Amino acid sequence: MNEMKFDMHCHTKEGSMDGKVPIVQFAGILKRKGYDGMLVSDHNSYKGYRAWEKHHRMLERAGESDDFVVLKGIEYDTIDAGHILVIMPTGSKLKILELRGLPVQLLIEIVHENGGILGPAHPCGEKYLSITNTAKYRNCLSVMDKFDFVEGFNACEDMDSNRRAKELAKHFRKPAFGGSDAHKADCIGLAYTAFDGAVRNESDLIACVRRGGVLDCGGVHYEGTTKDRLGKVNKLLVESFRFYNRLGSMWRHHSRKRELHRQFKS
């Protein structure tokens, strides 16, 4: 069995406003820790992955290579179901995924129509950010049947949140991913997902998930989260994020509408 170890939730300095570690440095830390690859999952942006592509092209021109696998993903901010991790087939380009604010049912439809997979990040975490703590889906979790996986372990979530996330994955018979959700260097590599077989690109990953090739996930809790540092004050930050997300969704309304028209017209 060819087992590969990935960190499946990674934020970079280039792609996430709150990311502190450039992607080349991020990948280097994971490689030194014995990881085979990572999923770039910046907030509503592929800028981090594009920075990696640029680095990779420079290596090729210099006649060098790197066997560490960097997969293109995104953490999408829905308007009604919190954060959703999305992976599209290799070479796929959907501008709509960089425009926050779609309702989750429409996001699921778009991703599946284009051959991708998706699942809720930290599903039992913070209010508004996590699907089981949203007003619309708190008591209506049948939508879980439509996902392809669940993030079962997130290093930035507490033990109870991760326990419930794994129970959710088990109840709906979904494979569970593990990811550090790292924004800072000291959080990188605190979670993992083990895959059965060679995963060299996004299409490999999608095929692996669909054939039941997710073996295990787990990790350790990161003690330096904003929630840990701020305590009760963190609730104010969560409320401000809700406002920011809705404002961002309104700001991108016309761009989303234009991209949706293009998507369904084609």
Set out the residue ranges of the language-model regions.
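Divalent metal-dependent hydrolysis catalytic cores, especially in the metallo-beta-lactamase
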Residues: 7, 27-47, 117-119
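Caspase-like (clan CD) cysteine peptidase catalytic core
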Residues: 98-104
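Short, well-ordered coil/turn segments that N-cap beta-strands
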Residues: 2-4, 34-37, 64-70, 114-116, ...
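Charged catalytic cores and adjacent phosphate/nucleic-acid-binding surfaces used
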Residues: 1-12, 16, 20-29, 53-58, ...
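Aromatic-lined carbohydrate-recognition surfaces of secreted/lumenal glycan-active proteins
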Residues: 117-129
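Short, well-ordered beta-to-alpha junction loops that form the rim of enzyme active sites
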Residues: 43, 121-124, 182
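Short acidic, glycine/proline-enriched helix-loop-strand junctions
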Residues: 46-71, 247
